[in-house]
């Protein structure tokens, strides 16, 4: 990891003239506690200023109510909910509002809202900012910082493949986000995938949709059938799983972003040549990529942006493949050996053999990516057709 910097004191600026605030002695104490917590984080000057700005804006928001939002557009759907870009009228802030429809008893609903309050304490440059959660008309609303670049699955659709040097920066942010959640809050993400990694025109990369509310996870499991394709083999088998499961999901996501399609079943030599524009050899010198000892299934992955024209693989075939077949890997000779090895360590089927967060943070691929000069914001804005720079909260419509 980067050398430790001296913690920079956090100053929350007072709210502007005419803004109503509810800052009493209790919330003053909360701000002091927040300053102490942020002081413990390894923030550079820019990260500190951005967190300060977000928290200053958040202090002006007050209690969130359904009637205070004007819809702007729909950002996407997934994880049992629809996400809208909205304007919060009292503060004029642009936010992302996720609506989750749940048929649940009031006691369960109140427990979910209570459990979501933990998100107020999740303040990190690698975690999407949280404004608050509330219940209205049969729906739970989770209001978050708006990330104007969208999610990495949306970026992938535009880019077709994401370059290794960009994925180096993504890997650093995801790892630091997972380390923060584990060390500061003792929680694991549980749902790492490209659609839960968000980016913005300032070049920030942040995790969202992690499992802070056990009750919400349970309620959604009863209501929705989500994609299970990023789950680790041990989790699919119903055995005990830990943060090592998040490591698997990150590795699988990186392969998808690097080759341009969900990597199960693996692309054959013909598809790899179509993807990379040249023959791709395996380590033995022969064309091809599949490590599977048995015949490759006839279906293609459930989702992806590749050139595979076979009928879709049924979800049960996909889950069987993840549990019983060799793990995906990066095609040899297209990427650096550091990146190949990093992904391989993430995708060991036995969680005991899989690299942990600390090992991955010290890996050569990450160490190289930390010192590499990469204009992530420039690449992102060019790919997504965004002006640069702009702020995620007051972004242009």
Swiss-Prot record:
A GO cellular component annotation in the UniProt record: early endosome
UniProt-listed SMART domains: S_TKc
GO molecular function term, any single one: MAP kinase kinase activity
Pfam families in the record: Pkinase
Modified residues (Phosphoserine): 219, 223
Binding site for ATP: 75-83, 98
Reactions catalysed according to its record: L-seryl-[protein] + ATP = O-phospho-L-seryl-[protein] + ADP + H(+); L-threonyl-[protein] + ATP = O-phospho-L-threonyl-[protein] + ADP + H(+); L-tyrosyl-[protein] + ATP = O-phospho-L-tyrosyl-[protein] + ADP + H(+)
Residues forming the catalytic site: 191
Claim: Transferase is one of the keywords in the record: yes
Record key words, sorted: ATP-binding, Kinase, Nucleotide-binding, Phosphoprotein, Serine/threonine-protein kinase, Transferase, Tyrosine-protein kinase
Keyword Phosphoprotein attributed: yes
Highest taxon in the source lineage: Eukaryota
Any single biological process term in GO: regulation of Golgi inheritance
Post-translational modification remark: Phosphorylation on Ser/Thr by MAP kinase kinase kinases (RAF) positively regulates the kinase activity.
Residue ranges, annotated region (Disordered): 1-21, 284-306
EC number: 2.7.12.2
Protein's job: Catalyzes the concomitant phosphorylation of a threonine and a tyrosine residue in a Thr-Glu-Tyr sequence located in MAP kinases.
Family of the protein in this entry: Belongs to the protein kinase superfamily. STE Ser/Thr protein kinase family. MAP kinase kinase subfamily.
Descriptive protein name: Dual specificity mitogen-activated protein kinase kinase 2
Gene for this chain: map2k2
